[in-house]
């Protein structure tokens, strides 16, 4: 299966630079049907994209801007939002403008069609791939899974520990690993992420009763305060006034109960702070997962994901 990278990851490669180095090189890339990448300079009033090719400019006509733009399944914002960003394309021809300057006619849609036929259409639930975060909403993360084609990672599938917004975990432009959760009849893919962040036991093995460790307050309830120790592990401390969600904390681990997936904590201190988002720790390098069981063996409550 051919792998297609997200937009922005090939623009600085030697082969891409060589293809943009001269008109002759661009003509050769047209003949060989090579996929190239360059920066979109503007989107005109007809929503054609103008692209900087270095030795000349290129135009991506509106109907060549994206797969699905013709039938309306992809909106024009998908083109407008590419301005000042890299776009992938194939050169489908050359023309002269009113000033007798040669320019290239480009197709982004052709690259996306190739990506869909040779890569995305062959994915199945449980496949683990890399993707790039393109933008975030309250409900989830939009990912470039190849050639500018997007998929969705819902917020409740990012981690076991609940979060208020995806920006707690990710940043725009970040490359992450995700697992294919489902594919609908239109070929739209929904992803998950929490299955790659380790089981309860794998995360709990990094801690021990008697330790005082850092955490983040994720939820304050009348019966207690949930503190995240890792993205896939949280514990419960007694309620204390003046502590709110988002606070950083130092917590003492009182006990750990694998058979109930419970960690009892004592909050030593809680405070407001701005710390860098820690790097993601993945617990598996597999490229496919059939089933993932979060719960420890013998636990009465079963938390699992079945992709088979």
Model-assigned labels for residue ranges:
Residues 1-308:
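Single-stranded RNA-binding regions, centering on S1/OB-family and related RNA-binding modules
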